[in-house]
């Protein structure tokens, strides 16, 4: 269920121009941004390229500007995918389901800090971690952006309000599958949902858009605004 799309347009893992800091949350190095006194936290879970990706950190800063305490943990333990490594080999030691226990430890640490509500957004690889948290109601609201490894049974099992942002061109979660996800969410009258497929973009565009692709840039901005609106509605 993983392929070249997960690896396209890898980020340059350089730091600088960020508003936040790297701190330790539970046992994980984490990029944190925003009001440390906020009672609402947003956890962003990266794709295979990890928590150091500049565009992911800039998105974290943007979410933080809405008044949230934003945490981007290093669930890859300092070992993000590098383009020279076959992704199937890398995944043997970096399964998203195995990261759920670490995600729960981050959530526990945030609650101990005084956080009362937690939302989570997962990108590609990270979406699987988020959906597992949503199935156990470990968070109050979920967002899955161009998800990988997420199944229809996963979506049927979520217990919190869930948004899914999909791409028109995506072999990992093609529009047909996203529409099935939407039907499953509609059938769950206990939760709210938001599903949208963005035209003209491909898997990974929300955090790995190409700067010279006007459509991808526009749709990334649109998706970011939709994500913020979703959190504002549910939190």
Regions found by a protein language model. Give the residues of each.
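N-terminal cap/leader regions of alpha/beta-hydrolase-fold enzymes
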Residues: 1-235
């Amino acid at each position: 269920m993983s392929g070249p799309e997960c690896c396209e347009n890898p980020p340059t893992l350089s730091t600088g121009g960020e508003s936040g800091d790297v701190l330790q949350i539970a046992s994980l190095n984490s990029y944190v941004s925003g009001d440390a006194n906020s009672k609402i936290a947003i956890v962003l879970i990266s794709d295979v390229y990890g928590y150091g990706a500049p565009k992911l950190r800039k998105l974290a800063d943007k979410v933080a500007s809405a008044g949230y305490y934003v945490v981007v943990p290093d669930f890859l333990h300092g070992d993000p995918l590098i383009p020279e490594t076959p992704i199937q080999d890398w995944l043997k030691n970096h399964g998203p389901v195995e990261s759920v226990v670490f995600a729960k430890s981050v959530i526990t640490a945030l609650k101990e800090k005084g956080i009362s509500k937690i939302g989570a957004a997962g990108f590609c690889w990270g979406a699987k971690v988020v959906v597992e948290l949503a199935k156990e109601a470990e968070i109050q609201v979920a967002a899955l952006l161009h998800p990988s490894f997420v199944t229809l049974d996963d979506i049927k099992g979520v217990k919190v309000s869930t948004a899914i942002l999909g791409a028109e061109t995506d072999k990992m979660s093609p529009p047909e599958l996203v529409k099935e996800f939407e039907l499953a969410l509609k059938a769950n009258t206990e939760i709210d949902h938001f599903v949208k497929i963005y035209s003209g973009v491909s898997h990974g565009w929300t955090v790995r858009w190409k700067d010279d692709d006007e459509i991808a840039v526009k749709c990334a901005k649109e998706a970011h605004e939709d994500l913020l609106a979703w959190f504002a509605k549910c939190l």
